[in-house]
A protein has these predicted regions:
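Short, charge/polar-rich alpha-helical segments
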Residues: 118-128
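Bacterial Sec-dependent N-terminal signal peptides
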Residues: 1-30
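Extended, composition-driven regions rather than compact fold-specific motifs
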Residues: 26-114, 127, 131, 135-244
Length: 244
């Protein structure tokens, strides 16, 4: 009789454990896409169905670029970002900041003027370059103190994101903006080596894989409000040092 009771307890504990694990997995299964936006993830590649703008709404300049350069698949992108901070009053050491960044592809603003398989791949690499920018921002935030922790600029260890985000964002956006234009100029206008560019981007993504956009990053923008209950969107970010 005692053995049966022990066995029943063991079975009960087993099922409790399974339920807890299942619940945890479900909580971690973050949504990374909406009807209008795709947030970058390594296993979510762009397809023709994602380009949902009616070709009849496309400006004549885009039609001309399609005819002149073969640039007939055109995507619309954005680099979404937000910083959530501890809400309300808090004790020393309890303040937290959480940064979310996710490259976004906007379906309603993206169009295929004329079907082109290479054109679709070119757009995927543009999306990947935005992911490079996101990873670089995270990397630089992790290493920024080494550059600015001197006698003239004092670093506050409690709020690294709200202090330095805009400066690093502007720095990376300028660099990768130029990179995207160079890429399009060489691959689309000059009909250069697309594979070389793709391999360069893929290699750099792999180098910075530790700083990849996570499903949680994406879900913050799908939900459009803080994920954690004790957090609120930061009201103030220090201005960029690159802007006077």
């Amino acid at each position: 009789m005692q053995k049966i009771t022990v066995m029943k307890k063991s079975i009960l504990l087993f099922f409790i454990l399974i339920i807890n694990i299942t619940g945890y997995s479900q909580n971690e299964d973050y949504q990374t896409e909406t009807k209008t936006h795709i947030f970058w993830q390594p296993d979510r590649k762009l397809t023709t169905a994602d380009f949902q703008r009616d070709v009849r709404d496309v400006p004549l300049s885009s039609i001309k670029e399609c005819g002149d350069y073969g640039y007939c698949v055109v995507g619309a992108y954005g680099l979404y970002h937000v910083i959530d901070v501890t809400k309300g009053k808090y004790k020393p050491g309890e303040y937290q900041e959480k940064l979310y960044i996710a490259p976004a592809f906007e379906k309603p603003q993206s169009v295929i003027i004329k079907p082109d398989s290479l054109g679709l791949e070119i757009q995927q690499t543009l999306f990947d370059i935005d992911e490079l920018c996101a990873r670089t921002i995270r990397y630089k935030l992790d290493h920024y103190y080494e550059r600015f922790n001197d006698s003239t600029i004092k670093t506050n260890p409690d709020n690294p994101y709200t202090m330095w985000f805009n400066t690093i964002f502007d720095e990376c956006e300028q660099y990768y903006g130029k990179m995207k234009w160079a890429y399009l100029n060489e691959v689309v206008i000059k009909k250069g080596d697309y594979e070389h560019w793709k391999n360069t981007v893929d290699t750099t993504l792999d180098y910075l894989k530790e700083y990849a956009t996570t499903p949680e990053d994406c879900y913050r923008f799908v939900k459009n409000k803080p994920i954690e209950k004790k957090m609120v969107k930061a009201k103030y970010l220090a201005p960029s040092l690159y802007k006077k």
